[in-house]
């Protein structure tokens, strides 16, 4: 933004800017300024930003150009430790995409005894060690993008790594580790028929 402001003052504003992303936060966010009545929780933070996947429907892939960034684990843990609440939310796009980073983060969070929710990929449903680490760290819920039960629709959106036949076992794995699952589902793909609503509801049940 410094360069943008300088260009405005100089009358040389460019049509587009592309900069490196820094996830360093120089000081604690002044959460006391927030009206907590207006939020599910005023204690929301992030450890990572972006996602390496390139799902066609997702703005994150375009905005971050399928890049993935991480904050220092120690910074995240220190921020969470300072929360005056036993509950908080990670607003990360895909918190567990870097497994080694996620494991280090969960190890750092575990001693704090806080509870939290996040977004993650359904593909971690077969990683028992990672799920166990999430549980120890206090994770109680995840939002995952099922998107659709139609493999052709998934392939058309560059999300063929989602496999509908594994949905049930993946969700069950989250449940075994004490996490509720909020599923993101979409309809209206070119491969869908008018029956998609009934079929999707039946599959979810």
What are the functions of these language-model segments?
Residues 29-182, 187-189, 198, 202:
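Radical SAM [4Fe-4S] cluster-binding motif and immediate context
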